[in-house]
Amino acid sequence: MPQDAPAGLAPGFLVAAPALADPNFNGSLVLMAEHHAQGALGFVVNRPGPITVADVLGGLDAGLRERAEGAGRADDPVLVGGPVQPERLWILFRPGPAAPEEGAVALGAGLALGGSRELLEALVRARDPGPYLLLLGYAGWAPLQVEREVGEGAWVPLPLQGDLVFDVPMEKRWETAVRRLGLDPAGFLVGGGGAEA
């Protein structure tokens, strides 16, 4: 049965229904950063890509790569944030005393988002920057597209919860989100759809 799409999906999460066949989003948990009349923007937060933090930092500055290695972050995967602009780097982080806030947007629930080289360098150089994720690309929806997909049951909205991003292992994020919806992942079945590729 279709459900009514909420008026404001951001900040929050979209949990992909198992029937969502689009390979870009099957089994995904999407952090919604923007949702307005012009469309929506979000980031898949549970899909590792083929490159690491060291790969990204090494292309910018060898010193940054060494700093990430020293902090034990060099082998962390860079996530596939979505199929739109897959070359564009985004940084999702937990603001804190050592984490810079300039060039970032607070999303709520202890999460902030930015995309500047300066922000990335400041996080890597900080003594204790707190957790952060690097993402390449994003998920984008045309006006009313995400509302239609939610109404068709392709996605189920979940309120923003910062711990889903930084305290739950990546491979458990979708399952944990489904459980927080009060559903059993094994029996969670609803309709189709998919964001823009």
Curated annotation (Swiss-Prot):
Pfam families assigned to the protein according to its UniProt record, in alphabetical order: DUF179
Membrane spanning stretches: none
Superkingdom of this protein's organism: Bacteria
GO cellular component assignments: cytosol
Family label: Belongs to the UPF0301 (AlgH) family.
PANTHER family xref list: UNCHARACTERIZED PROTEIN YQGE, UPF0301 PROTEIN YQGE
Protein name: UPF0301 protein A2cp1_4106
Species whose genome carries this gene: Anaeromyxobacter dehalogenans (strain 2CP-1 / ATCC BAA-258)
Record lineage: Bacteria, Pseudomonadati, Myxococcota, Myxococcia, Myxococcales
